């Protein structure tokens, strides 16, 4: 499988376990645990053979944590997920279908099906279309194009980093 999944966590506990359980075991998962919790690292790596938990020396935030994980990706594609994301069974397959239709893509992101976010369009049959930016809860990357952008700007610790990244990736593929 040509995909590595990166999840940045900070004491996400049971939520993180639910996320990992929703991911096909064939895919390697890098968890960046920003709380530097060695017990969680041991727990994750004992429970899930496909999980490697990395403990940075300090809390790197969302962008820095993702950069650490993405710098270790050796596959052509990476999927970053927030720890509270639960993937539907066909989610990864759908990312690859979209990637095959748009081979020069930079970032592909799903539509949130969480009804409490009323700003989102909940039409489940949306075609892939180019947008200026996406929400950072789940982003599927073409690593070739992402590497050209130098990943996330670590000056953004927790908010707006995905908007900045989207702007830079979009400028590279046009």
Where are the predicted features?
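Conserved donor NDP-sugar-binding/catalytic core segment of glycosyltransferases
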Residues: 85-120
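Cell-envelope/extracellular polymer assembly enzymes that use nucleotide-activated donors
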Residues: 2-4, 28, 164
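Short aromatic/hydrophobic "clamp" motif used to bind/position activated sugar donors
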Residues: 78
């Amino acid at each position: 499988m040509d995909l590595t999944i990166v999840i940045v966590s900070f004491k996400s506990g049971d939520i993180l376990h639910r996320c990992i359980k929703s991911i096909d075991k064939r895919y390697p998962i890098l968890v960046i645990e920003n709380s530097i919790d060695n017990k969680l690292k041991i727990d994750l790596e004992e429970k899930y053979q496909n999980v490697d938990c990395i403990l940075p020396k300090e809390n790197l935030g969302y962008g820095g944590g993702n950069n650490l994980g993405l710098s270790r990706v050796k596959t052509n594609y990476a999927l970053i997920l927030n720890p509270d994301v639960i993937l539907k069974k066909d989610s990864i397959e759908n990312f690859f279908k979209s990637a095959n239709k748009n081979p020069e893509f930079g970032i592909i992101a799903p539509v949130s099906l969480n009804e409490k976010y009323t700003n989102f369009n909940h039409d489940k049959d949306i075609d892939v279309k180019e947008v200026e930016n996406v929400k950072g809860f789940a982003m599927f990357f073409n690593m070739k194009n992402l590497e050209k952008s130098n990943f996330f700007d670590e000056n953004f610790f927790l908010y707006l980093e995905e908007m900045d990244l989207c702007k830079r990736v979009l400028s590279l593929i046009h």
